[in-house]
């Protein structure tokens, strides 16, 4: 049986079973204790099966911790609606449907190393590196005379993701993107 943990002892990054046996990743939590009542733990969690992020409240609850497996794998190619990844140690391959990678697919390019998250034999998703270099497929022309501080223009990456970039970025440039928010960070320097 898995280890039980008191709600007030939850820490960011832990995985637990939710009230309906969903697998939840703790993103944030706060513990509020009042003099006359039992403390309340407000917890922001991500459902690893659906990707939904919600706030839950626990009182003196004991929660079951979930032991998830993490494995480093490299992206090989896209096969229809599936992304194919390979373990560099044993060369085994897995396919993950793009529905499980709604946000992540915007930043998955050839040879990127990701961490595949599984529970027993169920694939829950992938963790990307914090920063990834990606080529710009198309960038609007810079507006002549627009020298305002932080002037931006639209660009599209080779993955199809669109974002705002500085005026000096051109089609074919490689840029660094933060995968947590999808924002431009810097021009890629080899």
Swiss-Prot record:
Pfam families, alphabetized: EFP, EFP_N, Elong-fact-P_C
Q: Highest taxon of the source? A: Bacteria
Extract the InterPro entries matched here.
Elong-fact-P_C (IPR015365), NA-bd_OB-fold (IPR012340), Rib_uL2_dom2 (IPR014722), Transl_elong_fac_P/YeiP (IPR020599), Transl_elong_KOW-like (IPR013185), Transl_elong_P/YeiP_cen (IPR001059), Transl_elong_P/YeiP_CS (IPR013852), Transl_elongation_fac_P (IPR011768)
Q: In which pathway does it act?
A: Protein biosynthesis; polypeptide chain elongation
Q: Which GO terms describe its cellular component?
A: cytoplasm
Is Cytoplasm there in the keyword field? yes
Q: Which UniProt keywords apply?
A: Cytoplasm, Elongation factor, Protein biosynthesis
Localization per Swiss-Prot or TrEMBL: Cytoplasm
Keyword Cytoplasm on this protein?
yes
Question: Under the GO molecular function aspect, what terms does this record hold?
Answer: translation elongation factor activity
Question: Per the UniProt entry, what is one GO biological process?
Answer: peptide biosynthetic process
Record-stated family: Belongs to the elongation factor P family.
Q: Briefly, what is this protein's role?
A: Involved in peptide bond synthesis. Stimulates efficient translation and peptide-bond synthesis on native or reconstituted 70S ribosomes in vitro. Probably functions indirectly by altering the affinity of the ribosome for aminoacyl-tRNA, thus increasing their reactivity as acceptors for peptidyl transferase.
This chain belongs to which protein, by name?
A: Elongation factor P
Protein source organism: Mycoplasma genitalium (strain ATCC 33530 / DSM 19775 / NCTC 10195 / G37)
């Amino acid at each position: 049986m898995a280890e039980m943990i008191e709600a007030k002892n939850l820490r960011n990054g832990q995985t637990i079973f939710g009230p309906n046996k969903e697998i939840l990743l703790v993103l944030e939590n706060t513990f509020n204790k009042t003099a006359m009542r039992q403390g309340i733990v407000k917890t922001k969690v991500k459902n690893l099966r659906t990707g939904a992020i919600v706030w839950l409240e626990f009182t003196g609850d004991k929660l079951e911790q979930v032991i998830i497996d993490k494995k480093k794998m490299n992206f090989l190619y896209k096969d229809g609606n599936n992304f194919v990844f390979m373990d560099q140690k044993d060369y085994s391959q897995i396919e993950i449907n793009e529905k499980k990678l709604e946000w992540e697919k915007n930043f998955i390019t050839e040879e990127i190393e990701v961490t595949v998250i599984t529970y027993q034999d169920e694939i829950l998703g992938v963790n990307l590196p914090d920063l990834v270099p990606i080529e710009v497929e198309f960038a609007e022309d810079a507006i002549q005379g627009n020298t305002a501080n932080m002037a931006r223009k639209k660009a599209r990456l080779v993955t199809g993701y669109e974002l705002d970039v500085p005026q000096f970025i051109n089609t074919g440039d490689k840029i660094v993107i933060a995968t947590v928010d999808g924002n431009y960070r810097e021009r890629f320097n080899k």
